Amino acid sequence: MVAAGSAALLIAGCGTGTTNHNGTSTPSPSTAASTPAPAGMPGMPGMNEPMPAGKGLSASESGFTLVPGTTTIPANTPTSFTFRITGPDGAPVTQFVPEQTQLLHFYLVRADLTGFAHLHPSMAADGTWTAPLPAMAPGNWRAYTQFTARHPSDVTVPLVLSTPLTVPGAATVQPIPAPSNTANVDGYTVTLSGQPAAGQDSPLTFAFSLDGQPVTDLQPYLDTYAHVTAIRVANLAFAHLHPQNPVNGDHGGPTLTVEAHFPDSGDWRLFVQFQTGGIVHTAEMTLTVG
């Protein structure tokens, strides 16, 4: 089953902003309501992506390490966050393979899943990345980096690395919405069908409607018609969902199928980002994986 809300899961999307469980935007990182679509760069379609290694809960995997410039972020004010990805030789990695139009996808998730942001940082020549963070509410957060790096042996390695972040101040923890198969955002309704099982590839289908009518004008967003991110409620593990629908101009919808692989059972929070009229919308729901 899935839970109602107005933020999102992970297939292929990006943006900045934050939404709470009531579907309203808050001054913390998440693109829940609506966000102008960012400019992209040529890359590989999401449906060709290999599955990243691990569950996204470690800063190191396969010899690569996420090295943050800091793990403490000031509350309620936009700031910049710098980090590097080091390789097996300990040197900063500067060679990445584009994935869904970007060299690296950066996610911010608050521990109670009320804050979410999908950002695309820039990389300097020395391998230092800079992400412009929106204002973040006090509390515990986790930053995820999703990328495909080139190993010194010229092998490509898809990875999700993460690190915990702390935003000082009085934090209010919100309960996770109960599972439901619909979510509403900006007048749109997103309905999910499918029964995923842990450890197996499971197709999930999202149906998009506006005022009760099927949506057929979804625009390409990061080389696909939607971007879905899944975060496990119990431990903030990360799951990657792959879009199956080919892109055919501004005519996406009314349904979109993704290939989901959830490593563990339990409740997962989904963040579904899709674009219409040049605006990225983020729908959020809770899904129970058996």
Pin down the residues of each PLM region.
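Surface-exposed interaction/gating patches
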Residues: 173-240, 254-271, 276, 281
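Beta-strand-rich structural segments
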Residues: 78-91, 145, 201-213
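Extracytoplasmic low-complexity, Pro/Thr/Ser/Ala/Gly-rich segments
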Residues: 23-104, 182
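Bacterial signal peptide processing site
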Residues: 14-18
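Residue-level recognition of secondary-structure-to-loop junctions
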Residues: 123, 129-137, 262-263, 274
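Aromatic sugar-binding surface patches on proteins
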Residues: 115, 124-130, 248-257
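Transition segment at domain starts
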Residues: 45-64, 69, 160-199
